[in-house]
Amino acid sequence: MVKVHSRTITLFLIFAVSVAAPGTSAPGAIGQGGSAGIAQTGPTIGSKARIQPLRPGFEFPRETLRFEAEYHFVTAGVATLRIERDGTQEHVTGVADSTGVVALLFHVRDRFNAYFDAQNLCSQKLIKHTEEGSHWRDTTITFDYKIKKAVLEEKNLKNGQSKRTENDIPGCVTDVVSGILYVSTLPLQKDAVYAFPLSDGGKTVTILAHVEGKEEIKTPAGTFQTIRVGPEGDYSALKNRGKVQIWYSDDSRHLPVQIQARMFWGTLTVYLAAIEK
C-alpha cells in the first residue's frame, strides 16, 4: 500500500490524475472511436473534445508555484511548477519529490520539462526523468502533428533497455504536465463542462472538466476565492483513483490552488504552499 500512496503523490502533483497509464485500456479514447460518454449536468463547450487556443488577455503566471502534498496530516511530498516563454513556445518545468517517512519507504524524484505552442496551446514535447522506487526511466514524447503521431522514446535506467513507439493523436492535444495549466486558460464558466484531448504518449483520452462551484480555500500561500473543477474520464484508470477535484483562483490568472483526491484508503491533498519569484 505504501507504493500506491507514494506514486499517487507524483501523479496528482503533475496532473496525471487525468490520464490513463501507458498500456491500460481507455474506452472512449480519441482516435479509437467513441467519446467520453459521461452524464453531464451543464453545457459542454464545443461539439467535441478539442484544445481551445489561448483566449485574448490571458497571461500565464511567471512565478514558481510550490506545492506540498498531505496525507493524514503528514507532509508526504513537495513539488514545483514554473512556466516561462521560450520563443514561440511555453516551457513548463515540474519537480516532484517524496519527503519524510514516505521518502524513506518509497523514493520519488521526478523531473519534467514540457513544451507547448504559446498560441494554439498544442503540446510539442515532454521530457521526463522519473525515479519511483526501483523504477528509474528517461522518457521523451514528441508530438508530430504532420503525421498525427506521438513518438515515445523511453530508456530503463536500471537495465539499459530502450523502446520506441508511435501512437495516434488527433490534430492537437495537451499532455500530463501542461494539462493543469491548459485548464487554467479556460473561462471556467459556472456549470460548464470543457472536453479536451490529453495524451501521455501512449494513449490519448477525452477529459471532461466540470466546473462545480466556488469556494474559499486557505493554504500557506494565502486565502483564495476559488473555482472548483472536477476532471473526469470514461476509463478505469481515472475511476480507480476516486474523486478528484482541482481548485483554481477565481481571478484572471486561475492559479491552481489545491488538488484533492478522495481514495478508498483516504484523502490526499496537494495545496499551494508558496508563490515565488
Where are these regions (language model features)?
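Bacterial N-terminal signal peptides that target proteins for export
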Residues: 2-12
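Intrinsic structural disorder/low-complexity segments
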Residues: 8-10, 35, 43, 170
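Intrinsic-disorder/low-complexity peptide segments enriched for small residues
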Residues: 9-11, 52, 155
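Bacterial N-terminal signal peptides
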Residues: 10-21
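Generic detector of low-complexity/intrinsically disordered segments
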Residues: 13-15, 29, 154, 183
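Ser/Thr/Pro/Gly-rich low-complexity, intrinsically disordered segments
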Residues: 22-27
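Acidic, serine/threonine-rich low-complexity disordered tracts
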Residues: 28-145, 182-277
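Hydrophobic, well-structured mid-protein blocks that either form specific transmembrane helices
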Residues: 137-183
